[in-house]
Amino acid sequence: MRCPKCNYLKSSVVDSRQAEEGNTIRRRRECENCHTRFTTFERIEELPLLVVKKDGTREQFSRDKIFNGIIRSAQKRPVSSSAIEKVVNDIEQKIRSDYDSEVSSVVIGNLVMDELAELDEITYVRFASVYRSFKDVDEIEALLQQITNRVRSKKKRKADETN
């Protein structure tokens, strides 16, 4: 590994540990020439994954687009950035394990919706209003009714479990 200070090509690894939930290895290195210490990260090079959009066009998968969409939907909500990061990691892991080279934007949107439904209902509704492009208030009411029914059934299950 080339030293960032003197450009010498040989360095030794001083420390090595996992980072980012085991998806990355962080290495602390020392240049054999000038003894400068620096950090490198090693991760698996993912094969490019293409997203097939509704109009048939393809673009490279971007976890940042998912992250930014959720951030916008979660504005002024009690949802931590670490919770959002976990949701994005879970979605990306599901996509990469289930799809080799292409995935539909509809599949991604549905995965995001499923995760947000568990994370925060308001964030879910905000995301859904953009993702589903509601045409009128009736469609929003139907979504709210689905959420209400889901919350009621969760409360009923919890009550049944405690009795």
Swiss-Prot record:
The keyword Nucleotide-binding applies. Its cofactor is Zn(2+). Transmembrane segments: none annotated. A zinc finger (unnamed) spans 3-34. Keywords: ATP-binding, DNA-binding, Metal-binding, Nucleotide-binding, Repressor, Transcription, Transcription regulation, Zinc, Zinc-finger. GO terms for molecular function: ATP binding; DNA binding; zinc ion binding. GO terms for biological process: negative regulation of DNA-templated transcription. Residues 49-139 form the ATP-cone domain. Binds 1 zinc ion. It comes from the Bacteria. Negatively regulates transcription of bacterial ribonucleotide reductase nrd genes and operons by binding to NrdR-boxes. Belongs to the NrdR family. This is Transcriptional repressor NrdR. It comes from Streptococcus mutans serotype c (strain ATCC 700610 / UA159). The lineage of its organism: Bacteria, Bacillati, Bacillota, Bacilli, Lactobacillales.
